[in-house]
């Protein structure tokens, strides 16, 4: 009788261990982490670039500023960095008030991962007759904020020689 009870206890223990292991496997397999899609992220960065160009040419400092994260840093040549979306909007607003030539931008390359994306761009400003006034290049780092890829760092400079003092 004692032997029979011992066998029952062992059998119940084996069944419980087997069931608990299966439940752990099921829980693990149902936890689906969204996969990062590089092609989708690249498309989003390209669309963000198009939005930036349109806003620049419309003179829309609010849309321009919203292309940046709240803690963004804009790093232009020969000046201190501008930090934060609000300050970046002020810069664009001052440029727009001074009069903006036509802006174009061409994406050269986009790369990155789910944490950070980067874009290499070539840009130009031209007058109403199409004459290039300035051209240059930039590197932008993007991070996800509020469900959108936004510029986190924007570093740009001109291809023209530095102005003489």
Describe the residue ranges of each PLM region:
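C-terminal motif of bacterial Sec signal peptides marking the signal peptidase cleavage site
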Residues: 17-20
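A mature extracytoplasmic/lumenal domain signature
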Residues: 68, 78, 109-111, 121-123, ...
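Short, low-complexity N-terminal intrinsically disordered segments enriched in polar/charged residues
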Residues: 22-66, 70
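Hydrophobic pocket/interface hotspot
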Residues: 52, 64-65, 72, 84, ...
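Sec-dependent signal peptide recognition
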Residues: 5-12
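Surface-exposed, charged secondary-structure patches
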Residues: 89-129
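A short gly/proline-enriched turn/hairpin at secondary-structure junctions
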Residues: 73-83, 95-98
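Short beta-strand edge/turn micro-motifs at domain boundaries
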Residues: 22-27, 135-162
């Amino acid at each position: 009788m004692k032997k029979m009870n011992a066998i029952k206890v062992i059998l119940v223990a084996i069944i419980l261990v087997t069931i608990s292991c299966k439940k752990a496997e099921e829980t693990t397999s149902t936890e689906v982490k969204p996969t990062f899609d590089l092609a989708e992220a690249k498309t989003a960065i390209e669309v963000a670039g198009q939005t930036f160009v349109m806003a620049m040419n419309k003179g829309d400092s609010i849309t321009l500023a919203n292309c940046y994260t709240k803690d963004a840093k804009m790093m232009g040549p020969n000046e201190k960095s501008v930090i934060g979306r609000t300050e970046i909007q002020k810069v664009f607003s001052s440029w727009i008030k001074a009069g903006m030539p036509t802006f174009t931008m061409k994406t050269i390359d986009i790369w990155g991962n789910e944490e950070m994306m980067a874009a290499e761009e070539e840009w130009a400003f031209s007058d109403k007759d199409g004459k290039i006034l300035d051209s240059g290049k930039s590197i932008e780092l993007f991070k996800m904020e509020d469900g959108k890829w936004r510029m986190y760092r924007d570093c740009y400079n001109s291809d023209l020689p530095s102005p003489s003092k």
